[in-house]
């Protein structure tokens, strides 16, 4: 038992010694939309369900993040990512545009594979990441009406699961990704309906190596 504990401590120490921490800034554009689901009964008591997705609106995001990189082998490493960003989400249905502004806190696990030299761009890597994202509602509107949060209004807390796929360059420390965010919580509605926020877009980051 003591030997196993010693091996675990040595392994953890070696990983910490190899680990690297990086900071970065990120911004981008997206096409956020929401998915509506409701259920009820018709006049005959038969269950009726309704599901639709809104049209997308123009979304933006920007913020800062940190990466904790642990090399596994020369060509492959794992990263833990955390950060904070401002985002515009929402959607549009039948002329009613919902714009919601959130402060988001992403937490993702990244897998990075080094491709080697990529012409004049220098060393490049491909990356894939997945993780939850917690958002706190700051404000918003439905056409000209201001959104109200809390009881009788919209839910201020939003949670989604985000997926990123992209490339990273070392000579010019830039990272570009495409992403999809799947809403897990409803931002508003009665107990028989839900409205979940989804998002798809592109993001560009600058890394301070």
Regions found by a protein language model. Give the residues of each.
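Surface-exposed loop and membrane-interface regions of Gram-negative outer-membrane beta-barrel proteins
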Residues: 48-53, 80-100
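Short glycine/proline- and aromatic-enriched beta-strand/turn motifs that initiate or cap beta-hairpins
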Residues: 19-67, 207-209
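Predominantly the C-terminal beta-signal and adjacent terminal strand-loop region
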Residues: 22, 33-41, 75-79, 85-87, ...
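Short loop/turn motifs that connect adjacent beta-strands in outer-membrane beta-barrel proteins
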Residues: 19-21, 71-78, 115-125, 172
């Amino acid at each position: 038992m003591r030997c196993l504990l010693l091996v675990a401590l040595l392994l953890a120490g070696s990983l910490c010694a190899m680990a690297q921490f990086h900071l970065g800034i990120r911004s981008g554009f997206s096409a956020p939309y929401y998915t509506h689901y409701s259920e009820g009964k018709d006049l005959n008591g038969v269950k009726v369900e309704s599901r639709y997705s809104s049209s997308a609106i123009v979304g933006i995001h920007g913020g800062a993040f940190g990466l904790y990189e642990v090399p596994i082998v020369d060509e492959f490493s794992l990263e833990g990512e955390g950060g904070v960003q401002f985002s515009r989400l929402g959607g549009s249905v039948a002329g009613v545009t919902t714009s919601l502004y959130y402060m988001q806190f992403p937490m993702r696990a990244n897998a990075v594979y080094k491709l080697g030299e990529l012409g004049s761009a220098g060393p490049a890597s491909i990356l894939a990441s997945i993780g939850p994202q917690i958002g706190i509602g700051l404000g918003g509107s439905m056409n000209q009406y201001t959104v109200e949060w809390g009881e009788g209004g919209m839910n201020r807390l939003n949670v989604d699961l985000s997926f990123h796929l992209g490339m990273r360059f070392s000579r010019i420390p830039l990272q570009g990704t495409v992403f999809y965010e799947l809403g897990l919580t409803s931002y508003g509605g009665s107990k028989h309906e839900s409205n979940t926020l989804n998002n798809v877009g592109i993001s560009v980051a600058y890394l301070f190596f």
